[in-house]
Amino acid sequence: VVTALAVPVLLGAAATSQANAVIASWNLKHAGWNNGKHLEQVAAVASHMDLIDLQEVMKEEVVSELEQQLEALTGDEWDSLVSHAVGRSTYTERYAYLYRDKTIAYQGGATVYLDPEDVFSREPLLATFVEKDTGRAFSAANVHIVYGDSKADRSPEIRALADIYDLMKEISPGTPAIIMGDFNMAPTEPAWGDLRTLGLRPLITEGATTLSKTDGRYASLYDNIWYVPSEWPKANGDVFRFPDYLGISHETARADVSDHAPIYLSVTGETLALLPLEGGQPQAAGAEVASRRASKTSSLASQTCIDLNTANADQLDRLPNIGPARAADIIRQRPWSSSGQLTRISGIGQGTLSEIVASGLLCS
């Protein structure tokens, strides 16, 4: 149960009747530990995506911080889902989904796989989303396979992904499903046989996704998206080689961002268009966005205050950094005795709570 509620030559895309959605996966290497991670650079890369699943989230507050970075950078509203901590030993981590509200909607069903045979060290996070432009739903599994001492330690988890795919199809018959994440195993290994038998194929078949310490060199193809090609007939994808985009060395990239590059699936097959950097830094949406948010907050403040115990989802969505998923979680966790308890909600840390209180929208 979820406790609250991831560079090629990039050219401009030709116009199509369907807006493109970009789905990605990224192992963020201990995001949330006090390791000097540069979230503004993470956001600069993630801003090219519409839905991105993250592995190695060590503290859920980092997802809220990244969400705010993305909103400041893109001018769009973003939302997120974060799992509870998973793991068998003293080392635990969380999974997360970040998604752009104007392109992707969370439909429901977020849950950590129950794992009846206790195969997984870190049980995957499942959820269903909708492409807003087409109304098409799809299910996603966010996975981080244990590394262990050898491939023999990883193979049982890889084989058990077939059970997860079967479950996703049982829960949502006829809905396309993808399994994405850091698999710590190349897609050519025999352990993938069960998933291949079900018709799934790896999106990325060439190259590698983990950064070596030598600039321009990548070591292993561990990160991927497994999908049924007939369910995504136009899709293609690639590795986003972010050190090239950010103009940094692999040593710096590994220290400040991650030792994995994200991989992405372009639903319509369009090529990504790189967003401009200024002096090696992303260009924020700036004063226009700040003005728009201030105007929104001002106009909302004049409306009836929001009661955490009686407001509906649309009313709760008016609060800063509260999207549909968090609104649903607030309703589910009622009653609330004080606004301070909102830190129980995934992605709401003290900083976000302060913004909510400062908005003046909550009933006193």
Question: What residue spans do the PLM features occupy?
Answer:
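Bacterial N-terminal signal peptides
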Residues: V2-G12
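Active-site-proximal beta-strand elements of phosphoester/diester hydrolases
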Residues: N20-H30, Q107-A110, R136-Y147
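Active-site beta-strand/loop signature of hydrolases that rely on acidic residues for catalysis
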Residues: I23-L28, V42-E67, L98, A127, ...
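Acidic/histidine-rich helix-loop elements
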Residues: S25-K37, P116, V146-D153
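Structured beta-strand-rich core segments of catalytic domains in phosphoester-bond hydrolases
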Residues: M58-T134
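Metal-dependent phosphoester-hydrolase catalytic domains
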Residues: E60, L167-T175, M185-V289
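Alpha-helical interaction/regulatory segments in DNA maintenance proteins
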Residues: S299, I331, G340-S364
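Small-residue hinge/turn detector
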Residues: G323-P324, G349
